[in-house]
């Protein structure tokens, strides 16, 4: 897959880059994408939901009245779930929602997501951006030059860069990640992927070695 490399003004530089077909040209596997997204979203859940049972709520454990002879129903004590303030029956308990996935499954899911972006022509390769200081306005201007001002974008860089990351994180709808931390959910959630030139050159190696979903 061959793409033009654009400069920060949104113009073609006259250079192109070849993205590997074994990643961007595969037939996407929807099921592994589903599994990877489910794993990602499950890992975001805290899972600490909890209600008290009749054994845990505060209150007397004394039986309210004798079992028989009153003409009323048998009740037990005040912690009975039938009473206000009583324990809960079958309420939520702490639970982990994350699931385990093999590395090969996660890699296939990531490549499938990239293949979808390639089919949608939603990948832009941008020449490397060097910023001396964090400047949100500067990066927002770059997006406008690329006609991506109102789109959700995922910016992929080869390694962490303080100035670039701080510049893009305050732009609405823009998410930044280093190539080794890229995951299936972020790829699919973005309308367009912006690869810096250096990241694009490392892409085939890093995706094959990555472990995140």
Where are these regions (language model features)?
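Glycine/serine-rich anion-binding loops at beta->alpha junctions
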Residues: 54-90
